[in-house]
Swiss-Prot record:
Reported function: Catalyzes the condensation of (R)-4-phosphopantoate and beta-alanine to 4'-phosphopantothenate in the CoA biosynthesis pathway.
Name of the protein described by the UniProt record: 4-phosphopantoate--beta-alanine ligase
Catalytic activity: (R)-4-phosphopantoate + beta-alanine + ATP = (R)-4'-phosphopantothenate + AMP + diphosphate + H(+)
Family (UniProt): Belongs to the archaeal phosphopantothenate synthetase family.
MF (Gene Ontology): acid-amino acid ligase activity; ATP binding
UniProt-listed InterPro entries: PPS/PS, PPS/PS_sf
Length: 266
């Protein structure tokens, strides 16, 4: 479990939420959960979050709804997590997994045994009962015995029970080459990525252009809500969603927002 933050940040600070996330990221680095490159990735994401106004755009909400419908329709959905995801949204990952089939797979670009075990500990310390009762399964550490075709890096190592046989994979904060490789395997890929121009965003089936800790609670909300819908309704939500159009609309949204910013707001 992540320990108490080293820096006391007053809740009145205008950057409170952002600073708290930075503290979590730094702590995850100290605990061996995060690779140093994860700090850079987080900073890059913050930049794009500023551009969208640090709130969930209506365009992103449409992607979240489509993602929720696709996850419910899936026969074997898997949530893929890396160090950044565990640092920022471990609670939400587990909550969503429990609404689905419980499968969470650890998949690291900078894969070391030490990082794998650190992430495994983070789940075991906080969700021991859920693991022991089978409500969630943490895959990809001791059972990463399959390889994604045409992906030579260690990132291609996956669990047969998890990503290798999944039909839908939720990949928060994913790399473009891996997202593309998963799509080429015939899988539906749901990405959470603040950069609408990234390869991940462009290659995925559904891209949620939003900050992880805002998007995940909304995704959980709509998964719970959409379970009451029939299959035909869910299929229509997915079929009506156009990822390329959604990304274009998001880029237009950012451009329009920047154009309309007043000097006072700047």
């Amino acid at each position: 479990m992540l320990s108490v933050m080293r820096m006391q940040i007053p809740k009145t600070h205008p950057r409170y939420e952002s600073l708290m996330k930075r503290e979590k990221i730094i702590e995850a680095l100290d605990k061996g959960i995060l690779a140093k490159a994860g700090l850079i990735a987080h900073g890059r994401g913050e930049t794009f979050d500023y551009l969208i106004g640090e709130k969930t755009a209506p365009i992103a909400l449409e992607a979240i709804k489509a993602a929720a419908a696709l996850l419910i329709l899936a026969e074997n959905p898997v949530i893929s997590v890396n160090g950044n995801t565990v640092a920022l949204a471990i609670d939400e990952v587990v909550e969503l997994a429990k609404e689905l089939n419980g499968k969470i797979e650890v998949n690291l670009f900078y894969r070391t045994k030490e990082r794998e075990l650190a992430i495994k500990r983070a789940f075991e310390e906080k969700f021991k009962d859920d693991i022991e009762t089978g409500k969630i399964k943490i895959l990809g550490i001791d059972d990463a015995n399959k390889q994604i075709p045409n992906l030579d890096s260690l990132r291609g190592k996956v669990s047969e029970e998890g990503i290798f046989t999944a039909d839908v994979v939720l990949v928060p904060l994913e790399d473009g080459d891996r997202a593309e490789a998963l799509v080429n395997m015939g899988k539906k890929v749901i990405a959470i990525d603040l950069n609408p121009l990234s390869r991940t965003a462009r290659k995925s089936t559904i891209t949620i252009v939003d900050e992880l800790t805002r998007a995940m609670p909304l995704l959980i909300k709509y998964v719970k809500e959409f379970k009451n819908k029939d299959r035909e309704e869910l299929l229509k939500i997915v079929e009506d969603f156009d990822n390329k159009k959604n990304l274009k609309d998001m880029i237009d949204y950012i451009a329009e927002r920047l154009k309309n910013l007043s000097l006072d707001e700047l």
